[in-house]
A protein has these predicted regions:
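Alpha-helical segment of the N-proximal tetratricopeptide repeat
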Residues: 31-65
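Terminal, low-structured helical/coil segments at or just beyond the last alpha-helical repeat
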Residues: 3-7, 13, 17, 143-202
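TPR alpha-solenoid repeat register
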Residues: 72, 106, 118, 151-152, ...
């Protein structure tokens, strides 16, 4: 066989494999996804950059495509928390917890992560509002559902934001210890630090 023909054939086959693989990845990434996932991811990116209004519109769009989309519901709750609309955030989180409790399948680790993150975030809201005993109960509930999901963030988060972030377990323990002290000796709120509490999203 002619070496030039063999080389041309090999190059064409290589290109065909690359195009087919790329097309498959593109299809899987954009077209073969559950309804609402794309808009939820866009909302999450905007939420992380502090663009709360646009983030909320993407989360709402995701919920139009897929009512009860757990990522979009959590995203809405986080927007409410970041904009200090705590009552609305509690309603969103209570709905999410109730819906997941009724519909979560046992073999869904991401769903368990969301079910743990919801009471952890509710605990943050209650903590900021001074309802420390209720906050502690929500932190404990989050730890019971899935401690790994609400534990210390990853390496990149530590480098970019905080090398020693507080965890749900740390905060629950701290509240418990403070509530054992006489009321005039308790230190349960430091507004500047409380405002920096890390929201949980699996």
């Amino acid at each position: 066989m002619n070496p030039r023909v063999l080389k041309r054939f090999t190059v064409l086959m290589f290109i065909a494999v690359l195009v087919t693989g790329g097309a498959t990845l593109l299809y899987d990434s954009f077209f073969d996804r559950p309804a609402g996932d794309y808009d939820t991811e866009r909302g999450d990116i905007l939420l992380s950059s502090g663009d709360y209004d646009d983030a909320m519109s993407y989360f709402n769009k995701a919920l139009e495509l897929s009512p009860n989309h757990r990522g979009a519901l959590m995203g809405r709750a986080l927007v409410f928390i970041q904009t200090e609309q705590y009552w609305e955030a509690e309603i969103e989180l209570d709905y999410l917890i109730d819906w997941l409790t009724k519909n979560l399948s046992p073999d869904d680790p991401t769903g368990r992560g969301v079910l743990a993150a919801a009471p952890a975030n509710k605990g943050i809201i209650l903590d900021r509002q001074g309802a420390h005993d209720e906050a502690r109960a929500n932190y404990i509930k989050a730890l019971q559902v899935d401690e790994e999901s609400v534990s210390c963030p990853g390496f990149v988060h530590k480098i970019l934001y905080d090398p020693r972030p507080s965890t749900v377990r740390d905060r629950a323990r701290y509240i418990h210890e403070q509530l054992q002290l006489p009321e005039d000796q308790r230190l349960l709120r430091i507004p500047d630090l409380d405002a920096e509490s890390r929201m949980h999203k699996p």
